[in-house]
Structure formats: structure tokens, C-alpha cells
Amino acid sequence: MIKGITSKELSIIKEILQTFDAKFYAYGSRVKGNYSDLSDLDILVKSNKNIIPELKPLFDNSYLPYIVNFTDYNSIDEKFYNLIRNDLVEIK
């Protein structure tokens, strides 16, 4: 479960993500529950190609009240993945 976001915000996030052929997982403080109102939303992107440059402007223009940061699964360090893997929440 992603914490600290409204159902309207989640709908905006899902609407943007559903246009891409990829899997998306939230992680970080908004999953763990140790977030503040100023916390960003961290999203791990699993895709056959790097779609992050396409995602960023869509979220920058989405009027969400927080920053959304993306991490490409194909380029992350194994140690970092091991730190976050138990906290991954798929965004469907």
C-alpha cells in the first residue's frame, strides 16, 4: 500500500502509467510509512527500454503535490535492489 496519497492522486498516477508497457513498483518512505507531506514518491520501472525520459514530463505536468522519482530496474545496483525489494508495492 502506498501511504500519504489520496485516491485521486493514485488515479492520476495509474492513468499515466497504464499507457506504458512496463511494470511499476512504489518503494521508499511512502511505502514504509515514514513519509512526510514533502516526501517524494519513488517508483521502480521494469521495462525492456528506458521509458523514464518519457515518464518524467508527464508527472512534472500532473499537478501531483510531490515529486515523483524514477529508478530503472535494469540499471540499479544489486545492493540497492536488495535494500528495497521487500518493500516493493506494484502499482496496477
Mark where each language-model region is.
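Catalytic core of pol beta-like nucleotidyltransferases
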Residues: M1-A26, V31-L38, K46-K92
